[in-house]
């Protein structure tokens, strides 16, 4: 994996270069302090993974990110910056991750492993399935924002404005309302079963009768989700059970 680090601070570049180079997947690390120098490096090295700061010596990191959108094969883009307020904007220009300074070894490892996995699973364009993909959902973590594919979500629940998004064996937490995230989820994939629950219909394993004419849904990950009386009719209709 060829890595390019674009940052106008020499010490930050040096630190990140050291952390990145500790991983066996990384075969080379190049550095640049400006958009112009970064473009030269990209023409020469064609990096697989790009760590990009926001404030550079000539233009903004977003200017470079915008240029990447026009490339036939853009590098795996990770913003690495001291500013947390630009995270949502970063994902709008196709960033895969957003990490904050000072850098932590564990987070760099997560980025490298995630990038390696995605590159290893890449399918040539002429053999890839052409089915439509849902837009990833940004989820605000403690110190970073995660992008989660809707089809990977099993369940979303809310309690006192605290959202829990269940993805495989992991649970992401964020502040918000169920309605706010429901609007971002594809209606063909998700069903609201209760004022506090939305589930992915493709993750349903079993539906059981419950008390007072309600239902209980068992998901493939073992989660149990109630279907309240006011949602039973709509739930059955969406599954073709009525």
From Swiss-Prot:
A GO cellular component entry from the record: cytoplasm
Residue stretches making up the HTH LytTR-type domain: 137-241
Matches recorded under Pfam families: LytTR, Response_reg
UniProt superkingdom: Bacteria
SMART domains cross-referenced by the UniProt entry: LytTR, REC
MF annotations from Gene Ontology: DNA binding; phosphorelay response regulator activity
Entry PTM: Phosphorylated by LytS.
Cellular compartment(s): Cytoplasm
Keywords of this entry: Cytoplasm, DNA-binding, Phosphoprotein, Transcription, Transcription regulation, Two-component regulatory system
PROSITE patterns linked to this entry: HTH_LYTTR, RESPONSE_REGULATORY
Residue span(s) of domain Response regulatory: 2-116
InterPro entries documented for this protein: CheY-like_superfamily (IPR011006), LytR-like (IPR046947), LytTR_DNA-bd_dom (IPR007492), Sig_transdc_resp-reg_receiver (IPR001789)
Disulfide feature: none
Role: Member of the two-component regulatory system LytS/LytT that probably regulates genes involved in cell wall metabolism.
Protein name: Sensory transduction protein LytT
Species in which this protein is naturally found: Enterococcus faecalis (strain ATCC 700802 / V583)
